[in-house]
C-alpha cells in the first residue's frame, strides 16, 4: 500500500485499488546484522510465523537455537528472502552492500528495509531495481544525503536532490526521516545510558559502550 491510498481511506474514499499486500506468515525474512535491535525484530517476525535467515560476521548461535533461525551466507540470504532488513554497521566492507550485483541475486519482488545507515544501499541501484520491478517495495528510515533534508519541515521547499525526489516518486517506497528510534522509552534509555557512561568515565570504570577508533 502507498501513502496516497492510505490517506484516501482516512478521508473516506474507501476503495482497495493499490492496497493489495501479502501475508507474512510462511514467508522468509533475511536479517543482515544481528545486534540488539535486530534480535528484537527477529523475535517479532517469528511471532508472525516467518522463517528467518540471518547473516552476521559474529553469529550468535545460542540466540539462533533459541529463536529457531538459521545463520547463512549473504548469497543464500539474498536468494531466499522475501523481505531483507539491514541492521549492520557502516564500514568499508558494508558500504553499498546493496548494489546492482547483490540485487540481481534477490527474489523478484523482494522488499528491502533499511533502518541502519544510508550508505548500506547504493541508491541508484535501488532505483533501478524498483523501476524494473526486481524490488517490489522499500522502506527507508535512512538516506545517503539525509542531513540536508531530514529533521526539518521541507513541505514548502523544492527538493533539489534528484535522486531523493525520484525515490519519493515511487508509490511502493516509504521514506521516513531517521526516526525509527523516536519513542519515549528509547529516548529515556539513551539518556540513561549516556549519563551512566559519563559517570563510569568520571569514576575511571570500564566503559561498556566505548567505541575504539
Task: Identify the meaning behind each predicted range.
Residues 1-28, 40-43:
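Phosphate-binding beta-alpha-beta segment of Rossmann-like dinucleotide-binding domains, i.e.
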Residues 34-35:
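Glycine-rich Rossmann-fold phosphate-binding loop(s) that bind the pyrophosphate
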Residues 47-65, 143-145:
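NAD(P)-binding Rossmann-fold cofactor-contacting core
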Residues 65-81:
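Short acidic low-complexity segments
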Residues 82, 88-90, 116-117, 143-144:
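Short glycine-/small-residue-rich Rossmann-like dinucleotide-binding loops
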Residues 93-112:
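Rossmann-fold NAD(P) dinucleotide-binding segment
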Residues 109, 118-213:
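Rossmann-like dinucleotide-binding domain for NAD(H)/NADP(H)
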Amino acid at each position: 500500500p502507498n501513502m496516497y491510498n492510505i490517506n484516501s481511506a482516512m478521508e473516506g474514499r474507501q476503495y482497495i485499488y493499490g492496497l493489495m499486500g501479502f501475508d507474512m506468515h510462511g514467508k522468509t525474512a533475511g536479517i543482515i546484522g544481528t545486534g540488539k535491535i535486530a534480535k528484537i525484530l527477529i523475535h517479532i517476525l517469528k511471532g508472525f510465523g516467518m522463517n528467518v535467515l540471518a547473516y552476521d560476521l559474529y553469529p550468535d548461535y545460542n540466540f539462533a537455537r533459541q529463536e529457531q533461525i538459521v545463520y547463512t551466507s549473504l548469497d543464500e540470504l539474498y536468494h531466499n528472502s522475501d523481505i531483507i532488513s539491514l541492521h549492520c554497521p557502516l564500514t568499508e566492507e558494508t558500504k553499498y552492500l546493496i548494489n546492482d550485483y547483490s540485487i540481481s541475486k534477490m527474489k523478484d519482488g523482494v522488499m528491502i528495509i533499511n533502518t541502519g545507515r544510508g550508505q548500506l544501499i547504493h541508491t541508484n541501484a535501488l532505483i533501478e531495481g524498483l523501476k524494473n520491478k526486481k524490488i517490489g517495495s522499500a522502506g527507508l528510515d535512512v538516506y545517503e544525503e539525509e542531513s540536508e533534508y531530514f529533521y526539518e519541515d521541507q513541505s514548502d521547499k523544492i527538493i533539489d536532490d534528484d535522486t531523493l525526489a525520484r525515490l519519493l516518486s515511487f508509490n511502493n517506497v516509504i521514506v521516513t526521516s531517521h526516526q525509527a528510534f523516536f519513542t519515549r522509552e528509547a529516548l529515556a534509555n539513551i539518556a540513561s545510558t549516556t549519563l551512566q557512561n559519563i559517570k563510569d568515565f568520571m569514576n575511571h570504570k570500564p566503559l561498556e559502550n566505548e567505541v575504539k577508533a
